[in-house]
Amino acid sequence: MTESNMLASAVQALAQAAPLAEQIVLFGSRARGDADENSDYDFLVIESSVANRAGEMVRLRRALRPLRMAADVLVYSRDEVTRWGQQPGTALYWALKEGRVVHG
């Protein structure tokens, strides 16, 4: 599967698993364009609200399991993104700064 097909399949799987997601952002080396064959996919899923962040991250990673891809999924609510997204040095900060919206 090509990289663009893998990305499209992953975005589709995440969007189906999280139908209320406001945005899905690809970040990290794949978004910057400096990925190599060993690079994973890094996704930020922004939802309107998140009751159980850890549980939601696990659930969304499981949605990607059939694709057999190395991926990390961060989940934040829109309010958390607004409050914490400008905190330098955090994964959320870099996801927003370097990432590109792939859904929503």
List PLM regions with ranges.
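Catalytic core of pol beta-like nucleotidyltransferases
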Residues: M1-Q23, A31-E37, E47-G104
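Short beta-strand->loop micro-motif that forms the acidic, two-metal-ion catalytic signature
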Residues: D42-I46
